[in-house]
């Protein structure tokens, strides 16, 4: 996993502490788009561009929000190739029909946009990236911030009414999103990229302890924060939809398959079958990326055949309607 140091690309490995625990670096770009005009970035249809990977759960959050809010015409999108090699994310539409080119600066690699935004940038080159076409700058590269902006700030240009952050539930949404981040969203990476047995064991214990907790929680209500789909569910969904196809095998998160959790599994099916969400899920990109982009985890790049999943299968969550 490379990174940029003072604007220069380095392929040096990073990510673990001295005890073998995977450490995720904080994102750097944190500006906000405000509907009230109180920031340097006002809401304007056509001004902003979203860079994503269809494989990445963090980027997937933002693509779902864009779809649920009907922002396809207001915010354009580019998709990187699923393979993340030594040069990290790359634009290669010639090699994959679901990948695109870069319309902003004609970049071959995503890191070129980071260098354009900050010639002295030091940090990881990650998706999602919310780009301002007008100034040629990165507005934000934190998935939770972008999800929140798409949820709350773009009402004037949205074509669908879908409140992912209802005022009455905001404190609970924030609490739940915080609660699932370390053990589940980042927990699968803590397990998969652990450099010691102790670090792996700790991550797996945290992960499945949290899954057990939310399995019980979802036995009494349809969604994480009650009866409506919110940002917290989007953050949970993008991890769960990758669990059996990838994390269970590739990241050795295999105490149980998600399919063995009846409430979590049916909850996953329920969200997947929500209008406009299924089309944001690309299992080919997901499996190809993980199995072929992490040589320290899977040196031969062999893509596992299973587990087979049917996300269109009937679910039982209507019992809470």
What are these regions (language model features)?
Residues 1-321:
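C-terminal alpha-helical interaction module
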């Amino acid at each position: 996993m490379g990174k940029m140091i003072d604007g220069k690309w380095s392929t040096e490995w990073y990510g673990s502490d001295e005890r073998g625990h995977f450490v995720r670096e904080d994102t750097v770009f944190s500006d906000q788009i405000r509907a009230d005009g109180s920031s340097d970035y006002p809401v304007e249809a056509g001004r902003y561009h979203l860079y994503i990977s269809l494989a990445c759960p963090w980027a997937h959050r933002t693509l779902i929000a864009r779809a649920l809010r009907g922002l396809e015409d207001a915010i354009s999108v580019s998709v990187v190739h699923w393979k993340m090699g030594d040069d990290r994310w790359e634009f290669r539409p010639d090699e994959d029909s679901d990948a695109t080119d870069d319309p902003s600066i004609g970049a071959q690699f995503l890191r070129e946009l980071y260098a354009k935004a900050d010639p002295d940038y030091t940090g990881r080159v990650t998706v999602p990236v919310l780009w301002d076409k007008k100034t040629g700058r990165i507005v934000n590269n934190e998935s939770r911030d972008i999800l929140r902006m798409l949820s709350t700030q773009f009402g004037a240009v949205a074509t669908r009414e879908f409140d992912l952050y209802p005022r009455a539930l905001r404190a609970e949404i924030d609490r739940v999103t915080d609660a699932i981040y370390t053990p589940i969203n980042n927990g699968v990476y803590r397990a998969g990229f652990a450099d010691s047995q102790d670090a792996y064991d700790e991550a797996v214990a945290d992960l499945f302890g949290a899954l057990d907790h939310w399995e019980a929680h979802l036995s009494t209500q349809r969604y994480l924060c009650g009866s409506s789909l919110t940002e917290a569910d989007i953050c949970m969904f993008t991890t769960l939809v990758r669990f059996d196809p990838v994390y269970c095998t590739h990241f050795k998160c295999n105490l149980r398959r998600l399919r063995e959790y009846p409430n979590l599994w049916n909850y996953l099916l329920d969200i997947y079958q929500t209008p406009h969400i299924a089309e944001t899920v690309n299992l080919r990109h997901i499996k190809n990326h993980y199995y072929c982009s992490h040589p320290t985890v899977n040196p031969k790049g062999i893509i596992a055949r299973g587990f087979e999943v049917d996300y269109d299968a009937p679910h039982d969550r209507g019992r809470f309607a």
